[in-house]
Protein backbone atom coordinates (compact mmCIF):
# COMPACT_ATOMS: atom_id res chain seq x y z
CA UNK A 1 0.00 0.00 0.00
CA UNK A 2 1.32 3.44 -0.88
CA UNK A 3 1.86 6.18 1.66
CA UNK A 4 0.25 9.58 1.61
CA UNK A 5 2.67 12.49 1.44
CA UNK A 6 1.81 14.64 4.46
CA UNK A 7 2.45 18.36 4.80
CA UNK A 8 1.70 19.10 8.47
CA UNK A 9 1.30 22.76 9.38
CA UNK A 10 0.87 23.72 13.02
CA UNK A 11 -0.61 27.21 13.41
CA UNK A 12 -1.81 26.83 17.01
CA UNK A 13 -0.44 29.09 19.72
CA UNK A 14 -0.46 26.23 22.22
CA UNK A 15 0.94 23.01 20.79
CA UNK A 16 0.81 21.04 24.04
CA UNK A 17 -0.77 17.63 23.60
CA UNK A 18 -1.27 17.82 19.84
CA UNK A 19 -0.93 14.54 17.95
CA UNK A 20 2.46 14.15 16.31
CA UNK A 21 3.24 13.85 12.62
CA UNK A 22 3.50 10.05 12.81
CA UNK A 23 -0.07 9.84 14.16
CA UNK A 24 -1.44 12.03 11.37
CA UNK A 25 0.50 9.93 8.86
CA UNK A 26 -0.98 6.71 10.26
CA UNK A 27 -4.52 8.07 10.17
CA UNK A 28 -4.19 9.36 6.59
CA UNK A 29 -2.62 6.09 5.44
CA UNK A 30 -5.61 4.20 6.85
CA UNK A 31 -7.96 6.12 4.54
CA UNK A 32 -6.54 7.59 1.38
CA UNK A 33 -4.60 4.68 -0.22
CA UNK A 34 -7.81 2.60 -0.21
CA UNK A 35 -9.23 5.02 -2.76
CA UNK A 36 -6.29 6.69 -4.50
CA UNK A 37 -2.80 5.34 -5.24
CA UNK A 38 -0.61 8.43 -4.94
CA UNK A 39 -1.73 11.36 -2.81
CA UNK A 40 -0.49 14.43 -1.02
CA UNK A 41 -2.51 16.03 1.78
CA UNK A 42 -1.89 19.17 3.80
CA UNK A 43 -3.13 19.03 7.39
CA UNK A 44 -3.21 22.45 9.05
CA UNK A 45 -3.89 22.64 12.78
CA UNK A 46 -5.43 25.98 13.72
CA UNK A 47 -6.94 27.92 16.58
CA UNK A 48 -10.58 29.01 16.73
CA UNK A 49 -10.06 32.42 15.09
CA UNK A 50 -8.68 30.94 11.85
CA UNK A 51 -11.27 28.16 11.80
CA UNK A 52 -14.03 30.72 12.35
CA UNK A 53 -12.76 32.96 9.53
CA UNK A 54 -12.47 30.07 7.07
CA UNK A 55 -15.84 28.59 8.05
CA UNK A 56 -17.52 31.99 7.57
CA UNK A 57 -15.76 32.68 4.26
CA UNK A 58 -16.27 29.28 2.63
CA UNK A 59 -19.40 27.88 4.29
CA UNK A 60 -21.23 30.98 5.54
CA UNK A 61 -21.15 29.59 9.09
CA UNK A 62 -20.35 32.22 11.74
CA UNK A 63 -18.48 29.94 14.14
CA UNK A 64 -15.38 27.75 14.31
CA UNK A 65 -15.76 24.12 13.27
CA UNK A 66 -13.89 20.87 13.90
CA UNK A 67 -12.61 20.13 10.38
CA UNK A 68 -12.80 21.82 7.00
CA UNK A 69 -11.89 19.97 3.81
CA UNK A 70 -10.68 21.73 0.69
CA UNK A 71 -10.31 19.26 -2.19
CA UNK A 72 -7.79 20.19 -4.88
CA UNK A 73 -9.04 20.12 -8.44
CA UNK A 74 -6.26 20.11 -11.01
CA UNK A 75 -6.81 21.97 -14.27
CA UNK A 76 -7.87 19.74 -17.19
CA UNK A 77 -4.99 17.74 -18.62
CA UNK A 78 -2.79 18.10 -15.55
CA UNK A 79 -2.34 15.02 -13.40
CA UNK A 80 -1.26 15.87 -9.86
CA UNK A 81 -1.31 13.74 -6.71
CA UNK A 82 -2.45 16.66 -4.53
CA UNK A 83 -5.68 15.58 -2.84
CA UNK A 84 -6.31 18.75 -0.85
CA UNK A 85 -6.16 20.43 2.53
CA UNK A 86 -7.64 19.59 5.92
CA UNK A 87 -8.00 22.42 8.40
CA UNK A 88 -8.56 21.09 11.93
CA UNK A 89 -9.37 23.33 14.88
CA UNK A 90 -7.63 22.28 18.05
CA UNK A 91 -10.08 23.87 20.53
CA UNK A 92 -13.19 22.53 18.80
CA UNK A 93 -11.78 18.99 18.64
CA UNK A 94 -10.79 19.11 22.31
CA UNK A 95 -14.19 20.52 23.37
CA UNK A 96 -16.13 17.94 21.33
CA UNK A 97 -14.06 15.08 22.76
CA UNK A 98 -14.87 16.25 26.31
CA UNK A 99 -18.57 16.83 25.56
CA UNK A 100 -18.95 13.49 23.77
CA UNK A 101 -16.84 11.71 26.40
CA UNK A 102 -14.49 10.30 23.77
CA UNK A 103 -10.75 9.79 24.08
CA UNK A 104 -9.03 12.84 22.59
CA UNK A 105 -6.75 10.77 20.35
CA UNK A 106 -9.77 8.93 18.93
CA UNK A 107 -11.52 12.20 18.13
CA UNK A 108 -8.43 13.59 16.40
CA UNK A 109 -8.21 10.40 14.34
CA UNK A 110 -11.91 10.62 13.51
CA UNK A 111 -11.53 14.21 12.26
CA UNK A 112 -8.69 13.13 9.95
CA UNK A 113 -10.68 10.15 8.66
CA UNK A 114 -13.85 12.22 8.23
CA UNK A 115 -12.06 15.11 6.52
CA UNK A 116 -10.10 12.76 4.23
CA UNK A 117 -13.31 11.14 3.04
CA UNK A 118 -14.62 14.61 2.16
CA UNK A 119 -11.44 15.20 0.13
CA UNK A 120 -12.18 11.94 -1.69
CA UNK A 121 -15.68 13.13 -2.60
CA UNK A 122 -17.81 11.64 0.15
CA UNK A 123 -20.52 13.74 1.79
CA UNK A 124 -23.26 13.41 4.38
CA UNK A 125 -25.91 15.88 3.23
CA UNK A 126 -28.44 13.21 2.21
CA UNK A 127 -29.32 10.35 4.58
CA UNK A 128 -28.05 7.63 2.22
CA UNK A 129 -24.76 9.50 1.72
CA UNK A 130 -24.39 9.94 5.48
CA UNK A 131 -25.02 6.25 6.08
CA UNK A 132 -22.39 5.24 3.51
CA UNK A 133 -19.80 7.74 4.76
CA UNK A 134 -20.36 6.90 8.43
CA UNK A 135 -20.05 3.19 7.62
CA UNK A 136 -16.67 3.74 5.97
CA UNK A 137 -15.54 5.96 8.86
CA UNK A 138 -16.54 3.31 11.38
CA UNK A 139 -14.68 0.54 9.50
CA UNK A 140 -11.52 2.64 9.34
CA UNK A 141 -11.72 3.73 12.98
CA UNK A 142 -12.18 0.13 14.11
CA UNK A 143 -9.22 -0.95 11.94
CA UNK A 144 -7.15 1.75 13.67
CA UNK A 145 -8.11 0.29 17.06
CA UNK A 146 -10.64 2.96 18.06
CA UNK A 147 -14.33 2.60 18.91
CA UNK A 148 -17.17 3.33 16.49
CA UNK A 149 -17.32 7.16 16.52
CA UNK A 150 -21.10 7.04 16.03
CA UNK A 151 -21.90 4.49 18.74
CA UNK A 152 -23.75 7.05 20.91
CA UNK A 153 -26.02 7.99 17.99
CA UNK A 154 -26.84 4.33 17.31
CA UNK A 155 -27.85 3.57 20.91
Swiss-Prot record:
Gene Ontology cellular component annotations, sorted alphabetically: cytoplasm
Cofactor(s) listed: Zn(2+)
A molecular function GO annotation: zinc ion binding
Annotated S-S bridges: none
Residue positions binding Zn(2+): 114, 118, 124
Entry keyword set: Cytoplasm, Endonuclease, Hydrolase, Metal-binding, Nuclease, Ribosome biogenesis, rRNA processing, Zinc
Enzyme Commission number: 3.1.-.-
Cofactor binding summary note: Binds 1 zinc ion.
Enzyme class of the recorded protein, top EC level: hydrolase
Keyword Lipid biosynthesis: no
Location relative to the cell: Cytoplasm
Record bears the keyword Nucleus: no
GO terms (BP aspect): rRNA processing
Superkingdom of this protein's organism: Bacteria
Cross-referenced InterPro entries: MetalPrtase_cat_dom_sf_prd, YbeY, YbeY_CS
Similarity comment: Belongs to the endoribonuclease YbeY family.
Purpose: Single strand-specific metallo-endoribonuclease involved in late-stage 70S ribosome quality control and in maturation of the 3' terminus of the 16S rRNA.
HAMAP family listed in its UniProt record: Endoribonucl_YbeY (MF_00009)
Annotated protein name in UniProt: Endoribonuclease YbeY
Gene: ybeY
